[in-house]
Amino acid sequence: MILLPCYIFGAQSVLIDSLTIFIFEQVNMKKEYPVKHLGAAQIPSSLPISSSSRYEDFKFVNDDNCILHDVAVSSINEEQAPHSFEQAGPRALSYFDSSKVRAGIVTCGGLCPGINNVIRTIVMQLHHNYGVQRIHGFRYGFQGFIPSYQHDIMDMTPENVRNIHNLGGSILSSSRGPQDPVEIVDCLERNNIRILFCIGGDGTLRGAHGIAEEVDRRNENMSIIGIPKTIDNDIPYCVKTFGFETAFSKAVEAVQAAHSEAYGYNYGVVIIKLMGRNSGFIAANTSLACPDVNFVLIPEVPFTMEGEKGLLHSLESGFEAKKEQGRHPHSVIVVAEGAGQNLLGNNSNERDASGNIRFKDIGAFLKENIQQYFKDRYPVNIKLIEPSYMIRSLPANPHDAIFCYYLADHAVHAAMAGKTDMMVGYWNGHFTHVPLEVVIKDQKRINPHGEFWRQVLFSSGQPGDMYSPK
């Protein structure tokens, strides 16, 4: 594979699977960012796995095992080893004594299908496979560590998590916003917790890295493991995040209903606003799965409303083309919440609890401008649908449930082996260990010059360029 030049963040575009090309900096994880380890693991693993098994899937994983960054390259430099990740999986030796160690779990940020699946698997794996008896859940995100909030700490047992995978949301609840790593580590020390699993998105992973740094400053032996969670699917070095498939599958149902609504009127227009602050994966995947969509607007691809190439003229041209073909003039527009913010004059420094810039409502903006433009042209009937919060509060679908199990399973193996300051990633069909230091440097975004976006354009039929400079 030839690495294409990148047009966002000055990085490189990297092939991850057969369809999607993401954009972020390419680095050699194993060489430049080795996974941190608390020390030598010396306790034989209690897992029923043999180092000498002739079946590869039933062997312990060695720290030297690598997952290649690229499955295809244009050439190989003999003097430079291929870029790779450390492979996830059970190790033959454990760092922590399972009869003594205590573990904690926290969920932060927005809800996402599959959180409870991850919690359940962590508890079950720690208890049944490693024999860890004391597992605690911290409620309401990082607030749960701070005494002033007075949140109770939950005892997590196999019995009280047995059926939680059938529920949406998080049994630990959540909150947004950072907390002082010093206070968090103080809480961990007070409760003698040596392993902490942080389930969350980019803000949570930044927080987890801050906790790991504070632990390191104190020279404490604590394992801090991140598990990526976001329906925006924008965590780098992870092909997909859990819950994403469930979320966009539900969004497809909304688009199908929207198409029926648009088709029910002459010049019917329905706008579906979906989540996606800086990355348009939900909008793009939903549109590709539902080819009734005519326009897909994402943060990675700028567009204008006015001008010959603008959205309004393109929408009008679509109406005229359908009339000429004897077809019913209507249109379905899918837009990510972070798209077109430059058109709304969003130069505000106002931020939410997570530190994200507060976006203005692109859905309402599109509706108002389309109504105004067609007022004296066509009798458009326009509606705005926002299924955002409905699609993220569902239980995980079967495929996501399996993915959650694998993520949590590998997180437990990493923690018991003494790994720390790392995230469990998923790359080229394998689970990996990715240092948080590099994860928090970037976001995964759609490459507007890549195969995936080209397929979205072909499916929707929208122009490849809807930007008219003034």
Model regions and ranges:
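Glycine/threonine-rich beta-strand-loop-alpha-helix active-site module
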Residues: M124-H151, H209, V215-A258
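N-terminal phosphate-binding or glycine-rich loops at protein starts, especially the Walker A/P-loop
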Residues: M29-S45, F96-I146
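Accessory alpha-helical/coil subdomains and C-terminal extensions
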Residues: C187, C198-G200, R206-N221, T241-V380
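Glycine-rich oxoanion-binding loops at beta->alpha junctions
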Residues: D63-F96, G144-R194, I231, F242-S249, ...
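C-terminal non-catalytic interaction/assembly regions of soluble proteins
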Residues: V27-Y55, S348-K470
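Short glycine-rich or small-residue beta-strand-to-loop segments that form or flank ligand, phosphate
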Residues: R102-C112, S170-S173, R194-G200, G226, ...
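Short glycine/serine/threonine-rich phosphate/pyrophosphate-binding segments
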Residues: C112-I122, F145-I146, D180-I184, D202-G210, ...
